Structure formats: C-alpha cells, structure tokens
Amino acid sequence: MKRTILTAVSLLFLFVLPPHLSAGPRSWQQAQKIAERIGCWAKNSVAPMTPGNVFLKMGDKETAVPLKLTNWGDTEVTSISYTFYYTDKQVSEGPFVLNLDQPLKDGETREVKIPIKPGQKLGKEELLFNITQVNGQYNEASAGYAYLTCCTVNKMPHKGVLVEDYAGMWCWHCPIGLVATDAIARMYPDDVVAVSVHKTDDISKVVSRGVYEGLIDRYAVTVPAVWVARDNKAAGFDITDAFKIEKSKVTYMNMEVDAEWDENGNNIRVKTQVEPCMLPDEGETFAIGYVMTASGLSDDKWRQESNYAEYSSDSYKDAPEEMKFYADAANYVEGWSQVKGMVYNHVAIESQGMDNGLEDSKMTDFRADEVKTHSTTFEGVNKYSVIRDRSKIEIAAVLFNTKTGKIENAARCSVRNHGTTGIRPNLVQEQKKTEGIYDMQGRKVNGKPTPGIYIVNGKKTVIR
C-alpha cells in the first residue's frame, strides 16, 4: 500500500511558491518562512519511512531495527514517544520514549534504532509503528506511522547479491561494466556473487558453448549490460546504489554451497544446502542454478577495445581504482583504442540451470528447521585450457523462486582439494590468501616492482 505524507510544505511547493523559488538549496527555508506567515507550518511533526520486512531472531530479547525518521516541523526534535499495534493479535504496546543523542533538525532525515521483540513463533506479523508525541507534545504529522512486516526467524538470513556483467572485447564501452563489477566484488566480498559473461569475443570461443544459453540474447541485446539480481540494469562505473537496494531486500532463505575436486582432479562436485529461516509461503517453490567461474584469465594475443581519451579524462577521476588500467597510456596499442595485458575476472566458463534453476533441484514443502540439499557436477574441467590457475575457479549457486521468477539468494565458494574439509561460503577471511606480489589487475609481479599500489600477500600495499 502506498502511503503519502501531505504537509504544509508540500502544498506550498505545489501551489504557493513561484517557479523561481520552487527549487534549489534555499527552497526549504523560503517555504518555511511563507508557512510561518500564514500559520500553517507544524512545530512538532515527525514521520517514519516504511522499512518493509524486518527480521527478528526467536529467543533474542529484542532486535534494534533501523527506521528512518523525517522532521517536518520547524522545531528541533530531541525525543519521540511511540506505540506498537500488532494487527494480527490486535494488541497495543507502549508508549515508549526514544531520546535522540543529537537533535533532529527541521527538514532532516535520520536513521534511528527501535527495539522490537520477536514473535512467539516463526513467521510474519504485521506491526503498526505510531509516533504519538514529539518533544513531549502531540505529533502533528499527517502520517506519523509506518507499517512493518516483522519476520521471526530461527537464524538471521544472509543475502548474497548476484551481479552479472555482459561484455565483449570488441566493445570500447565494456570496460565500464568490467570495472564496475570488479569494484563491487572487491568492496563487498562477503555479499557479492559476480559473474562476467562474454558475448561473441575471444573468451566466448574458449568457454562452454552453452554457457548462459538463451540469457545473453535476453539480457545483453547491447553491451555493456550489468544486471543486479536481474531486477535492476545498473549504469556507470559505480553500481553501489543498485547493489545496496538489492541487498536491502532481505531473504528468509539461507543457502550455502560447497565444491571439491574429485579424486582425478578433472570434475568438480558441488553440494548446496538451503535452509529457510522461517517457513515459506504456501505454494512457493525454489530451484538452484550454477555457474563455474574463473578469474585471472589473460592471453598475450587478446585486445580489449577501449578509449584512452575517454577513460583518462576528468569524467572518470572518481572512478574505482580498477579504471586506472584503462587510463594508463602504457597499456594501449593500435592508436589508443585497444589495451593489451588485460586480466578478466569472474568469467562464466560453464553454467547449469541459470534460466530459472535446474529441474531436479526444485524444492517445496519445507518444514521448520529443515535443510534441503542438492548436488551436481561440473565434468571435464581440464578441457578449458584458458584457466591457468585452478585456485581461481569458483562455483556460484543461485536460488530462484520459481513462483515469482525472482532471484531469492546467491552464494559462492572456491573449490577445495579432494578429501579436504569443506569451507563455509561468503567468508572471504577463511579463504587462503594469495602469496606474492600482484598488480591491481591481478598479474603476478616477478622481480623488483616499480613504485605504485600492489597486492602483497593478500593486502593492498603502496611500494615507493
């Protein structure tokens, strides 16, 4: 349900202020002055934003839930009083008082933490959060309330975000997508599941012919195309906002993936575990798709179309550090339009069921505390000679909600040696750190490095 806050200031912007005053940094103050003259500006007025689903762990005393508050009045806010109303049980609680560490200024929006108790059983419960008083006075906001869906779970879910980059060596715009994907994977290693799909170029010739079959035509009519959970086509070299939006859509379906080489070192055995933190809605069915990816791919013959004049310009001065490779004249050949020495990461080598999950992986009718598993195998991996370093192979597992067609969750893991203990996914700190010195493109540096930024034993280091 869409709820709109209608206040005096919004009416002023629409009907009172002339066009030359209706925008710009002074518009809020101008509207406030006019409202004060005509006596329609509220003094104590705070409205919350609806956060959607919030997760509360059963057994915990309470959970500090983040909520955003906006001060629509002309008085700084030092405290609010609020109540809870559980719509299912028709029970009220409160009032409670929240004293702010710093006053909330007029026009300011700020996130605060509201303690909420979990339910007595797993599942969803609708909660009305209502701000009754501001600074000890009646709350004048026309919509001083917000509806929350409280999800009581047996364990807090972890959400992995699938980021798919479609690229081609023949495309001089594609470095933007490559940089964006590498950067977001570096910035959020515990939360991003990155896959780079190449379209009709030298890499597409040396990976599986069936990789992402049908999906390239659907999602990459033009490239670059960076999709976040296939819901949001992100643009530019910074896709942080798109990532955060998807990350905020918390799932209640946890998943973990584990992979190991077989005894011959040619096949990868994969096992995925799916555990609901609370029971899914009736009729919901889930299925799993898989991608085998490899990083550190390079070839002396490869050339990536680029544009030195573009990527070395001020337009990219705030770009992630990965863009420096394309802004370095030393990497260019063929008249400043192609780069050599590129290292490609997260490349999709082979995939299974990445349209909407494998048929034999479908899962439904979950019971409380039940963990469902699925296994698959990537066979004949040694035939992909483009993979020079087997330690940089990863398996990505993607959980699809087949009822909604949406991606519910994603996870990734490295491939362990046969017979070794499995590792937990999404915990990069548990993975073996790469020894030696590497440049920012992932290439190992032999001999004494020139001054610059390098990865030394897994840590970023400035060598002078």
Task: List each language-model region with its residue ranges.
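Terminal connector regions
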Residues: 120-155, 394-411
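Terminal processing/anchoring signals of secreted or surface-associated proteins
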Residues: 1, 171, 226, 420-426, ...
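Local sequence-structure signature of Cys/Sec-based thiol-disulfide redox active-site neighborhoods
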Residues: 153-192, 197
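Residue-level detector of functionally pivotal "anchor" positions at catalytic/ligand-binding pockets or at interdomain
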Residues: 36-49, 150-161, 414-441
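Bacterial Sec-dependent N-terminal signal peptides
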Residues: 1-28
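C-terminal tail/sorting-segment detector
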Residues: 3, 453-464
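Short, conserved sequence motifs used for protein processing/export or organelle targeting and
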Residues: 31, 35, 39-48, 52-55, ...
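Intrinsically disordered, low-complexity Pro/Gly/Ser/Thr-rich segments with frequent PxxP/GP/PP motifs
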Residues: 90-120
